[in-house]
Amino acid sequence: MHLPPQAAGPYRSRFSYNTQTQPPEKPRSSAELKPQSPSLITEKRPRPGPKGRNRVAFNYECCNYFIIAVSLLAGSSQYTLVSGPDGPLTRRYAPTSGKPSSGPLRPRTEALSWLKAGMVWQGWGWVR
């Protein structure tokens, strides 16, 4: 019966010693972290938060407006460019009834595909 109390004594003393050494470290670390963590959180959250939100919104708005502008410009230039060469082509191929339908449609589809590819690449470039 004497050995367990003796065994418990050193364990208690070690435990109390550990608890004594740990509490000063814990309050210090918590005291150091408490002022730092709120300050860091308050500094980090508002600074990146609004900036990140503004940046994301700004990027999306820029992308939307840029894509809309490019689509409008591409659409206007596409119609003007396609209508320009198609006019003479339709006039040239006017005698033959089959060629005007196949002739002007090919440049239009090619122009559409190229414009679409350009839009996709420009969109990816702006997003990244």
Curated annotation (Swiss-Prot):
Which keywords are on file for this protein?
Answer: Plasmid
Name of the encoding gene: repA4
Q: What is this protein's record name? A: Uncharacterized protein repA4
Chain spans, region Disordered: 1-53, 85-105
